[in-house]
Amino acid sequence: ADPTSGFIKDNEAEFTYIQEQTGKQPAIRGIDFLTYHLDENGELSYQDYAAERAIEWTNKYGGIATICWHWSVPSSTGNYAFYVESANANYTDFSISKAVTEGTKEHEIIMKDIELVASKFQMLEDADVSVIFRPLHEAEGAWFWWGAEGPEPCVKLYRLLYDQLTNVYGLDNIIWEWTGYTTPNSAAWYPGDDVVDLIGYDKYNVSDGIPNPSAIASTFYGLVASTNGQKMVAMSENDAI
């Protein structure tokens, strides 16, 4: 298939606009591994060439690609989704607790998906492309399946994912980022200093539907303090800036 198809050009629209208006490309570009999950036939249901686009962009512009993964899993209704029922009409009731338990159908499903994304990261490594990877993002918000059952299974899944990609598949081109918060329960969600390189914060500061451009510096300083200043802190998503 042609990675320069119409769909791929749509993915480039915002970056083309920025280039046209400023003459420059952003130094960091976010790419989603959204389509990297296997269906009931063990195949990709859709392909948007995210890994290939990351390689092309970083090689062409010399920037840094940051990867998130809206990880779709099956629901008992037969569809694939990443939201829970309370968050979106297209939802999954997939159990993360079962997914981190060996011998379950859910565990088999996630291990096959991890194998798939490992092959994509290997593709990146073979092209000498290192990336920031931000898996299981916004877990504490509980609107995605990986945060729906509390911190313990989420931490287990993050550490499983880290172990598989780093130790089993031998990948060393990944900078690991965790989406942090500053609530009283945030420490319980933190996977651990040994498996996190960066702390990210997704800044959506909306009141009455209107984004607030406040820097909310106290939140970012709180994240710095949460790891005693040992981890860099990034704004990993944002509305107004």
Which residue ranges define each predicted feature?
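Extracellular/periplasmic catalytic domains that process cell-envelope and extracellular macromolecules
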Residues: E20-K24, W57-K60, L124-D128, Y169-L171, ...
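Alpha-helical scaffolding within the catalytic cores
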Residues: K9-I18, Y49-E52, L116-K120, T179-P191, ...
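N-terminal module-boundary/linker segments of secreted carbohydrate-active enzymes
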Residues: A1-D48, I55
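Structural recognition of the beta-strand scaffold that forms the well-ordered cores
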Residues: P26-F33, I64-W69, V131-P135, I175-T179, ...
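Glycoside hydrolase catalytic-domain groove-lining segments
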Residues: T183-I241
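Aromatic-lined carbohydrate-recognition surfaces of secreted/lumenal glycan-active proteins
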Residues: A1-D2, R134-L136, E140, Y158-N185, ...
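Substrate-binding cleft of extracellular glycoside hydrolase catalytic domains
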Residues: L34-L171
